[in-house]
Amino acid sequence: MKKWMMATAVVSLMALSACNNGDSEAVVETKNGAITKDEFYNEMKERVGKTVLRDLIDEKVLSKKYKVTDEEIDREIERIKEAYGTQYDLAVQQNGEKVIREMIKLDLLRAKAAIEDIKVTDKELKEYYDNYKPKVRASHILVEDEKTAKEVKAKLDKGEDFAKLAKEYSQDPGSASNGGDLGWFGAGKMVKEFEEAAYKLKVGEVSDPIKTDYGYHIIKVTDKEKKKTFDKMKEEITFEVKRSKLDPSTMQSKVDKLVKDANVKIKDKDLQDVLEQQ
């Protein structure tokens, strides 16, 4: 996530570099003087120029051989959202979705290059598929004690509205105001007792009170993804299994080799050591 916080600077530098020819046009004017495009560009280059240039070189070299689809970027975004939650949302607010998607695309290009020579067996792929659980979408009502949980469940059994009761009773500040909606989640994202109960429910079905360390939950599954066939998931599974075997040093060395083979020539004397810095 940290590198995404540089994304605004990256985009600004790229835009300014296109028009930087000793440009004295002001980007900011004050009563104490102006800040020119040239001054702004040079300062940006000094602060983040080498990082930006390395990213641009990697993208240019890798995109010639490897392709990343919008669907792959979407899947990666979902994975990142599950792992980082509000940090991802903050990155999008600060930098814009387009910039974040470009950063993710570059990460996937690097990963595809690095995993190219990693071997996986059919057994490993089948095992991953068998253990894979599609995402579910659920709502819940969280209360502190079993007595209250049973009272709420009785109201639900009589046909009262789940979302309305969630707003009235639920002690989960993150979902109560949304009628208890937790959104989509996959395996391993909830505590064990909650997850097991949610995955057993059919769409529209409501659980009995489930006890966890947080209290008592009443769960309603509102939607479920359908599990694709192995053949339809094979490419995605192969990538994930290979990536699980990858270490950062392997990725860096593979990308470095491809960049070296591309015979990159850096003409800006201030940035000529970019490829020597890791």
Swiss-Prot record:
<dbReference type="GO" id="GO:0003755">
    <property type="term" value="F:peptidyl-prolyl cis-trans isomerase activity"/>
</dbReference>
<comment type="function">
    <text>Plays a major role in protein secretion by helping the post-translocational extracellular folding of several secreted proteins.</text>
</comment>
<dbReference type="InterPro" id="IPR023058">
    <property type="entry name" value="PPIase_PpiC_CS"/>
</dbReference>
<dbReference type="InterPro" id="IPR050245">
    <property type="entry name" value="PrsA_foldase"/>
</dbReference>
<keyword id="KW-0449">Lipoprotein</keyword>
<dbReference type="Pfam" id="PF05698">
    <property type="entry name" value="Trigger_C"/>
</dbReference>
<dbReference type="Pfam" id="PF13616">
    <property type="entry name" value="Rotamase_3"/>
</dbReference>
<feature type="domain" description="PpiC">
    <location>
        <begin position="133"/>
        <end position="223"/>
    </location>
</feature>
<feature type="lipid moiety-binding region" description="N-palmitoyl cysteine">
    <location>
        <position position="19"/>
    </location>
</feature>
<dbReference type="InterPro" id="IPR046357">
    <property type="entry name" value="PPIase_dom_sf"/>
</dbReference>
<dbReference type="InterPro" id="IPR037041">
    <property type="entry name" value="Trigger_fac_C_sf"/>
</dbReference>
<dbReference type="InterPro" id="IPR023059">
    <property type="entry name" value="Foldase_PrsA"/>
</dbReference>
<dbReference type="InterPro" id="IPR000297">
    <property type="entry name" value="PPIase_PpiC"/>
</dbReference>
<keyword id="KW-1003">Cell membrane</keyword>
<keyword id="KW-0732">Signal</keyword>
<dbReference type="InterPro" id="IPR008880">
    <property type="entry name" value="Trigger_fac_C"/>
</dbReference>
<dbReference type="GO" id="GO:0006457">
    <property type="term" value="P:protein folding"/>
</dbReference>
<dbReference type="InterPro" id="IPR027304">
    <property type="entry name" value="Trigger_fact/SurA_dom_sf"/>
</dbReference>
<dbReference type="GO" id="GO:0005886">
    <property type="term" value="C:plasma membrane"/>
</dbReference>
<protein>
    <recommendedName>
        <fullName>Foldase protein PrsA</fullName>
        <ecNumber>5.2.1.8</ecNumber>
    </recommendedName>
</protein>
<keyword id="KW-0697">Rotamase</keyword>
<feature type="lipid moiety-binding region" description="S-diacylglycerol cysteine">
    <location>
        <position position="19"/>
    </location>
</feature>
<keyword id="KW-0413">Isomerase</keyword>
<dbReference type="GO" id="GO:0015031">
    <property type="term" value="P:protein transport"/>
</dbReference>
<keyword id="KW-0564">Palmitate</keyword>
<feature type="signal peptide">
    <location>
        <begin position="1"/>
        <end position="18"/>
    </location>
</feature>
<keyword id="KW-0472">Membrane</keyword>
<comment type="similarity">
    <text>Belongs to the PrsA family.</text>
</comment>
